[in-house]
Amino acid sequence: MIVFNIDVMMARRKMTLTELSEKVGITLANLSILKTGKARAVRVDTLNKLCAALDCQPGDLLEWQAD
């Protein structure tokens, strides 16, 4: 299963969910869905915006874990 490590990167950047939401242009509700792993899919455009806002690589945000 793919796990999002958005909270880890947010902590490293000392950024709140609200700040990230504003930078990326995603609602808090949708960002929370991504953060909690409840999202079924993520658009490449969204991943690109997250990486730009958090100054990181996609591999910093995504991690595969065995079920």
What is the predicted role of each segment?
Residues 1-16:
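A short, Lys/Arg-rich alpha-helix, primarily the initiator
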Residues 3-4, 43-47:
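Short alpha-helical elements of helix-turn-helix
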Residues 45-60:
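DNA major-groove recognition helix of helix-turn-helix/homeodomain DNA-binding modules
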Residues 8, 28, 33, 40, ...:
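Short, charged recognition helix plus adjacent turn
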Residues 10, 21, 51:
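The alpha-helix within a helix-turn-helix
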Residues 15-33:
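Short alpha-helical DNA-recognition segment
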